[in-house]
């Protein structure tokens, strides 16, 4: 699985909107949308860390295949 599909799956499991993830991660909505849609396939570790913290998961959960 890609980062995009992992993010989408985890976000859906938590019942979080894209906007909620962006707000909790202190990132722009555009950044979250680009990652989840696969436009940005290589987000920085800082970005991944913020998203993981917002979703209450480990970075590994986002990047695992």
Model-inferred region functions:
Residues 5-24:
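Short basic helix-loop element that most often maps to the first helix and adjoining turn
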Residues 46-61:
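DNA major-groove recognition helix of helix-turn-helix/homeodomain DNA-binding modules
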Residues 1-2, 61-65:
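Short hydrophobic/aromatic patches at helix-to-coil boundaries
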Residues 27-42:
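Recognition helix of helix-turn-helix/homeodomain-like DNA-binding domains
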Residues 24, 42, 53-54:
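Residue cluster at the C-terminal edge of the helix-turn-helix DNA-binding motif
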Residues 10, 45-46:
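Short, Lys/Arg-enriched C-terminal cap helix and immediately downstream tail that follows
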Residues 7, 21, 32-35, 62:
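Conserved hydrophobic/aromatic packing and binding residues within compact polymer-binding modules
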